[in-house]
Amino acid sequence: MEAVVGVKYRPVVFPNGGAAAAAAGKSKATPASATAAVYRECLKNHAASLGGHAVDGCGEFMPSPAADAADPASLKCAACGCHRNFHRRLPEAPPSPPLLALPPPPPPPPPPPPPPQPQQHLPRTAAVAVAPQLLLHGSHQRREQSPETDRVRGPGHHHDDDAAADDDDSEDSEMSDYDDDRSASPLQAPPPVLSPGYLPSATHMLLSLGSASAPAVAASRPHAAAAAMGPPPPPGAATSASRKRFRTKFSPEQKQRMQALSERLGWRLQKRDEAVVDECCREIGVGKGVFKVWMHNNKHNFLGGHSARRSAAAAAAAPLAPPPVLTDFSINGSSTHAAAADHAAATASGGGGGSPQST
């Protein structure tokens, strides 16, 4: 007989904590490997001990050939030698969603209606050919209505009815031409298809360009010109223009006393003279501010400053009087009056003997 030896299996003990951890690590490795991640530049600060900041410049994590997925400590970069945790982890970007289908563009707006076209008239012969039918139709209607009108009017009105009927026939014949032209006109051609960018002129614009509206436009131009001359002034402006500024009026005695006070003060107000000015203003009967303004306005009139210069400028701008005409001056040294007197004396002495040149 064979002896059956009981074999007991010992669980594998791992240094990082039991057999369950290995199984859990295997189960977790699958989703980690399924979700791939990209590791970019290295962010390790090599100057942290010095209180600064310096990186090695590695741009992307490169796994080392000796790296083992089961040993996390072996996951170092082959370029900079730093662990993978120092590199910036960039998860794989999710796939871009499908492009959304844009809605179809809206249909173009319908073209505007075409402008009204003038009606086409048939020749006169066609209108005359259709007119008798309308005349017969109108006379038949009047014959149907005639018995009732005869009973109302009596037998004495037949002649008037016949005359009125003749007039109606003539009117019907005149109107029938117009009706025939409208009814016998051929079918209108379908309106042309216009492009979306074409904008026909409005009816009122077409009418305004006609010759019939020219007088109306010309008549409206004077009113437009009168309106363009300028808007009427607002009512407030008229009242402000009519309102006059209040001016203080002084008596001759007040003017003399204020002139005397101004000359006493030297036509200048100073702080030391405030008491004198207040007392004199009360005696004169004017306020201190009014006296100050009067003195400022009349200072140049009495001192001969600005007013004197103004009068001198006005005198210089006045035209000069023309120089006097000297009638007594002569080139030969004798006056004009003396020469005239000598000539008169010579003429008188000669008498009828004639002039000295004649002898």
From Swiss-Prot:
Gene3D superfamilies tied to this protein: Homeodomain-like (1.10.10.60)
PROSITE patterns assigned: ZF_HD_DIMER
Gene Ontology cellular component terms for the protein in this record: nucleus
Example GO biological process: regulation of DNA-templated transcription
Zinc finger (ZF-HD dimerization-type): 39-90
An example molecular function term from Gene Ontology annotations: zinc ion binding
Subcellular location: Nucleus
Broad class of the protein's primary localization: nucleus
Positions of the UniProt region annotated as Disordered: 91-124, 137-196, 223-254, 329-359
Gly residues composition-biased segments: 349-359
InterPro entries: Homeodomain-like_sf, Homeodomain_ZF_HD, ZF_HD_homeobox_Cys/His_dimer
Superkingdom of origin: Eukaryota
Compositional bias ranges of the Pro residues kind: 92-118
Keywords: DNA-binding, Homeobox, Metal-binding, Nucleus, Transcription, Transcription regulation, Zinc, Zinc-finger
Compositionally skewed regions (Low complexity) per UniProt: 333-348
Compositional bias (Basic and acidic residues): 141-162
Annotated positions for site Required for DNA-binding: M295
DNA-binding residue intervals: 243-306
Ranges annotated as biased composition (Acidic residues): 163-180
UniProt comment concerning the protein's domains: The homeodomain differs form the typical one by having namely 4 instead of 3 extra amino acids inserted in the loop between helix 1 and helix 2.
Subunit details: Homo- and heterodimer with other ZFHD proteins.
Function of the molecule: Putative transcription factor.
Protein's name according to its UniProt entry: Zinc-finger homeodomain protein 10
Species of origin: Oryza sativa subsp. japonica
